[in-house]
Each structure stands twice: as structure tokens, then as C-alpha cells.
């Protein structure tokens, strides 16, 4: 069992110097500890739900002038007694206060342990716990919006409704089992299949939402690819509006991919400058770079295929070859160095082709507008749509659907006892999302990603 009966302490604010810092204590002895070291200016009893001004004193020495906040269980973040100390942001003061509180019987918290205790004490479910980390890490309007919705319990509520529907299916099967000796069928199998189909349909909608949710949370991946020395790095820098990648007229300068982000209209884009594709190279390092390029292409939402000439047959051959290898990928053809090309484009048999000069910026804004427009098509959502952003949830929902499909397939061919096992397994996978069914390994993996003070 996970132990949570002692008192923990941690610095809750980012490390380093600052105007203020916050130190958080949680556990049965947190208020007892603060009463030993805090001298209130008001000389009154330290009460909960009030802010108190005073000194932290230790061995007759004043350490700092602080504000303290007391939260009595169960009305606190962790469901335990909590004290938060707001002190000056000196590194010495922070470490000294931490040391004093540990001397008084607390121990240093593990990463995410405050939120873990909130989960163990029933203040939040596992889905909401993950959303807190997402809120802390949110960089854009949409990543913040999804995290807030998850924290409010929107996904948890939907899972509870789906679980209830699955329990109804299970009840029908169990009822059939209870009266199996009567040689009577109590299940209306047509109605049962209809209920099963509706549950699967809702789960599939959640699974489909993951592509959108993941893109909006982690960023839309845009890989810039092409032969060596066609201007990929120059375009990469121009899109980011600063010199992020080394630019040289020597072919093969970029041996590894370089990635950086840009936020446009609340959406995060992850632009990736890749190694030039030279299938004839004998250079081992260059081959490794090209291998990574193809790996990035496979994971990209959009590919910018850069060329620096107008050989239509060559270009379409290259694009067709890539499209055959990655049939679901969206590809934009980029004709770079257009200012140097004497033969101008009249017609070109491809939907998305952009004439640019990455060096001088010609056509880059138009390209950026099209990239933004593309993002809207893959991220368009109806108002109040529930979207999943966690890979863990996605995998659990896929497993739940797998077992429900087994029930659908075997409905008329196997004993209700075996159908019951598959339905229970599907129910368990939904329970894993909210933490109703879990183990210590899952909890450790989730909460280890938090900072120590959270």
C-alpha cells in the first residue's frame, strides 16, 4: 500500500531567486510544526481560513517575515491539514525553512506527492490528477482549455455514464446466469446488441478525438524535408522568425533534425528541420540523419517538401514516391529560391504548391496562412466536445472496445459466463482511466512526472 500517514514538505514555486517563494506542508503534524516556529504579529491563536503575518523563528533567530495560510482537513488540496508559507524568494531562506521543517518531523515530498495524496484521499480522480499536470504544462489556449475541462471532471462524468451502461449489460448477463438451470432466455438479444453498439459508438468517438486532442495539446507536427541544400534550414528559420538552424551552402550541413515551436492563434506548431534526403550517400552519419528524417515524416501531421528547381517530372515522381510510402500524410510542395528560377510556373498538376524565397521571405506568409488553415481542418471541434489528450486514456479505451467487440462477436456462440468475463474486463479498462482500478506502477508513472511541490 502507498503510505500517506506522515507529514511532507516541499518548495512549491520554481527553483531560483524570485520576489517570493511558497513552501507547502501537508499531513497530520503540519499545523503542529508551524505553531512551533511561527510567531504571529497579532499574538492571537493561529486560525484556519485566515492569512497570518509574522516571523519564522528558530533557535531564537529570525529567519524571515512571512505570510502563512492554514487549511484544515478535509477542506484542503490534499484532504489533509495543509500549511503554505509565503516567504521571500532567497535561495538561502527557502532551503533554511525547508531544513527547519524537516528537523521538526516532516520529510521531503516526492514528485507529485501532494496531488497523489489528493487522489488517495478522494479529492480528485486519476483523470483529474493528470489534468493538473496538463494545466501546469499548458502553453496554448487549447491545451489549457482541454486541461481545465478534464480537471472539472467532464471526462470522468462521461466515463461514469459509460460504466453504468456497461454495468447494465453485465446485469442482464448475470441475470441470465442466475436462471441458467431454468432453460429460459431472459435476454432480448436485439435490445442487448443495440445497447452494446451505442456504448462502442461512444467509445470510438472518444478514440477519434485523441488525434485532435493530442495535436492541440502537444502541437501540430510539421516536417520540412527535401534534398540537401534546397533551403530547408533557411525556411525553418524564416518560419520561426529567428536564426535557429545553421545555414550553409555546403550540402549536408544538417545531419540531425532540429525542432522548435511557434504558437499561432492559440495553436502550437512544432516545426522540424530535417537532414537532407540523399539516398546515394555513403556517409554513415548522413545515413543516420536520413533515417531520422523518415522517422519524423512518419510522425508528422504535415510535410513541407522543399525543391529548388522546376523539373515537374522529377518533383511529382518524388512526391508520388513519398505519398505511396505515407498515404495518409498531407504534403505541401515548396518551390524555394523562386527569385533565382528563370522558368516561371504556368501550370503545375498538384493541389498545394507554394512559390517562395525563404532567404528574402517572398511567399512565406502565404505558406504560413495555408499551414494555419490546414490546422483548423484537422482541429475543428463542435462546442462542448469532449476530447481526450492522454495516451493512457486512448489505450484504455481501445482495450475496452476490443473486449466489447468480442462480446458482440460471440453473443450467440458462447456461454453467458464467458461474455460476463469480457464485459467485466472492458469495465475494468474504463476504471483504469479514473483510477477506480489501478496499481502502484501506474500511479508511480503518472505522479513521477509532477514537480516536487505539486
Curated annotation (Swiss-Prot):
It is found in: Cytoplasm. GO terms for molecular function: GTP binding; GTPase activity; metal ion binding. InterPro entries: G_TrmE, GTP-bd, GTP-bd_TrmE_N, GTPase_MnmE, MnmE_dom2, MnmE_helical, P-loop_NTPase, Small_GTP-bd. Binds 1 potassium ion per subunit. Residues 219-376 form the TrmE-type G domain. It is an enzyme of class 3 (hydrolase). The keyword Hydrolase applies. It comes from the Bacteria. GTP binds at residues 229-234, 248-254, 273-276. Mg(2+) binds at residues 233, 254. Homodimer. Heterotetramer of two MnmE and two MnmG subunits. Exhibits a very high intrinsic GTPase hydrolysis rate. Involved in the addition of a carboxymethylaminomethyl (cmnm) group at the wobble position (U34) of certain tRNAs, forming tRNA-cmnm(5)s(2)U34. This is tRNA modification GTPase MnmE. It comes from Karelsulcia muelleri (strain GWSS) (Sulcia muelleri). The gene is mnmE.
